[in-house]
């Protein structure tokens, strides 16, 4: 079993750990146990967390010496109404469909936007502001290189906001390494993260990053009220056929190119 690296944590007086309580974060949180007495554990609530995750985080947080639940932007629904749905549909990583969907009448009534904009305002900016307020001397992250295999050293430097006082204890771990650690230490996870699924479940309203049909099925089965709110009450049902129409239009071009290459 691989070991975590916590270089510099002994000297740190105010370490901070942003924890989603997913598998990676939960593994790192377990490894942090010897230093939890001085580590600020921060749960970044994007406003669209699955209810069981939010409850799990706060219940777990009650037993931590230092814990903060940060929800700077409030409910995701307010942002959806004013700024649009976080969506980013790509075709084989060749061109995004967001712009073409935006001009359709049905979709324009509800608006869509890049999911990265949503992430920045609901996760990264609140994290930055809280860090400026708390002034930690060591940043701890559960990020892994496997999550971003094409990122360069410069990319990782940017993600660290230029600070040198940061550590990623499981940076070189694989998914299998993480699950091996979790199983060996019998670490419990919130219901939403227990399925060992490959999609991301940080926000039930996200239609962008790592979207899978299993994630939508899970929402319908476990949280039917939220599913109905997304696809009925809030009008997303109107966007679905628009997305399909644009998707078919885009793929038809590349199918045509493939046929030309075969001639």
Whereabouts are the PLM-identified features?
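ATP/NTP-dependent adenylation/nucleotidyl-transfer catalytic domains that generate, transfer
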Residues: 11-14, 177-179, 183-263
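ATP-dependent adenylation/nucleotidyltransferase module used to activate substrates
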Residues: 1-184, 263
